[in-house]
């Protein structure tokens, strides 16, 4: 029997991650994998959800510093990995995550331009060798994605960043995805049907190789 794995969906705002996750869950279930835990980052535990609020919300009269944001994200990630993801995998449950460490590498390392060696040290110190078995990166032009996000309602603190921030974030996402065989890039600007088809094909190909 195939061992339980950690699968992650990544992407910019408006890339269709929620729809992609539904397609991933449907594809796994069609492959006979029923025991699945869903997570999201930042968040996924009561304490990590509080940290999510601190990262996402505006703070009246106080600017959330880039380093504070980064440390909050990793603190939330450690809570989730140690208290939810690792125990689930040990219990033979698959885990499907809405974002993981790649988000920090792209948003904070790329978008915020935080030093690459600091990013690597922080990841290595907090996560060690732990990483997803398979990642789908939903690639979209930031302008298209933000237009979609605006259509959903009010933007959060990060979604209000200028376009150059998201362009740097996308550039880093693509750089990292192209350097890692466990990450598949999906064109998220296609029709919903074509995106779903590409996700199913990529995931089924990966499952067949396990």
From Swiss-Prot:
In which domain of life is the source organism classified? Bacteria
GO function terms (MF aspect): ATP binding; dTMP kinase activity
- Tell me which Pfam families the record gives: Thymidylate_kin
GO CC aspect terms? cytosol
**Keyword entries, A-Z:** ATP-binding, Kinase, Nucleotide biosynthesis, Nucleotide-binding, Transferase
Which stretches are transmembrane? none
Q: Which Gene3D superfamilies match?
A: P-loop containing nucleotide triphosphate hydrolases
Binding of ATP occurs at 11-18
Q: What does this protein do?
A: Phosphorylation of dTMP to form dTDP in both de novo and salvage pathways of dTTP synthesis.
Q: Which family does it belong to?
A: Belongs to the thymidylate kinase family.
Write the protein's name: Thymidylate kinase
Q: What is the lineage of its organism?
A: Bacteria, Pseudomonadati, Pseudomonadota, Gammaproteobacteria, Vibrionales
């Amino acid at each position: 029997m195939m061992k339980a794995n950690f699968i992650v969906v990544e992407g910019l705002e408006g890339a269709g991650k929620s729809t992609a996750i539904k397609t991933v869950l449907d594809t796994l279930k069609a492959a006979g994998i029923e025991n699945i835990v869903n997570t999201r980052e930042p968040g996924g535990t009561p304490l990590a959800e509080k940290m999510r609020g601190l990262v996402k919300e505006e703070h009246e009269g106080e600017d959330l510093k880039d380093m504070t944001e980064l440390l909050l994200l990793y603190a939330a990630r450690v809570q989730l990995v140690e208290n939810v993801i690792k125990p689930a995998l040990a219990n033979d449950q698959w885990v499907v995550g809405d974002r993981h460490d790649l988000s920090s590498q792209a948003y904070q390392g790329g978008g915020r331009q935080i030093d690459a060696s600091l990013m690597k040290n922080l990841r290595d110190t907090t996560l060690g060798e732990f990483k997803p078995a398979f990642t789908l990166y939903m690639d979209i032009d930031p302008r298209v994605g933000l237009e979609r996000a605006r259509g959903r309602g009010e933007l959060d603190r990060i979604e209000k960043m200028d376009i150059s921030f998201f362009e740097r974030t996308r550039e880093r996402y693509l750089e990292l995805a192209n350097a890692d065989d466990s990450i598949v890039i999906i064109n998220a600007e296609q029709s919903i049907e074509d995106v779903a088809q590409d996700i199913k094909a990529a995931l089924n190909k990966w499952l067949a190789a396990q």
